[in-house]
C-alpha cells in the first residue's frame, strides 16, 4: 500500500508533465508564472524527500544521497526564486495542482516506511520523480517558457536532475543486487 502511493505520485507527475504544450496550456494555463511555480514546487518536493532520506535512510549512502539532493535542490530553488524576483514574476501554481496532493501522499508513505523498505521506496520515488521532471522540462516546460533567462536557468540545471536520476538508479540497482 505504501509503495503504491509513492509510485502513484510518480505516475501523476508523469501524467501531468507528459501532455503536449498546447494541451497543457489549455488545461493549466502554462505561462511563465505557472512554470516558475512548477519549477519551485519540484525543487521544494525534492528538498523534502531528500531531508527525509537524510534522516531516515538505513545506510550512510542513502542518508548522504538524501542530504545531497536537499542541498542541490535548495540551491536550484533559490536560483529560481532570485530570477523570478529579478524579473518581477510572481509564481502562480496551476489551479488544480493535483501533484501537490500526490506529493503529500508520497511523503506520508515514505514517513511510514522503515529501514530498507524506506530506502527502496525512496530510491524508486527519486528515479520516477526525476524522470518525470526531465520529461516535463524537455517536452512541456521549455517549449512553453517565453522568458530567455528562465529558459537558460532551466536548461542549466537539467543536467543535475539527470545526474540525480542516474545516481538514484545506481543506488537502487546496487540495493537490488545485494538481495
List where the protein language model places each region:
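His/Met- and acidic-residue-enriched segments that coordinate or traffic transition-metal cofactors
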Residues: 2-9, 17-179
Amino acid at each position: 500500500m505504501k509503495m503504491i502511493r509513492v509510485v502513484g505520485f510518480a505516475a501523476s507527475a508523469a501524467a501531468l508533465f507528459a501532455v503536449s504544450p498546447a494541451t497543457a496550456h489549455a488545461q493549466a494555463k502554462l505561462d511563465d508564472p505557472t512554470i516558475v511555480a512548477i519549477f519551485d514546487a519540484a525543487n521544494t518536493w525534492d528538498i523534502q524527500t531528500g531531508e527525509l532520506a537524510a534522516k531516515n535512510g538505513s545506510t550512510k549512502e542513502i542518508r548522504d544521497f538524501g542530504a545531497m539532493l536537499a542541498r542541490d535542490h535548495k540551491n536550484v530553488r533559490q536560483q529560481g526564486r532570485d530570477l523570478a524576483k529579478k524579473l518581477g514574476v510572481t509564481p502562480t501554481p496551476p489551479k488544480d495542482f493535483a501533484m501537490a496532493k500526490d506529493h503529500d501522499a508520497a511523503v506520508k508513505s515514505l514517513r511510514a516506511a522503515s529501514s530498507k523498505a524506506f530506502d527502496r521506496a525512496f530510491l524508486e520515488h527519486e528515479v520516477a520523480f526525476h524522470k518525470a521532471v526531465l520529461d516535463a522540462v524537455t517536452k512541456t516546460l521549455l517549449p512553453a517558457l517565453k522568458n530567455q533567462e528562465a529558459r537558460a536557468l532551466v536548461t542549466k540545471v537539467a543536467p543535475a536532475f539527470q545526474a540525480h536520476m542516474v545516481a538514484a538508479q545506481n543506488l537502487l540497482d546496487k540495493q537490488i543486487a545485494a538481495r
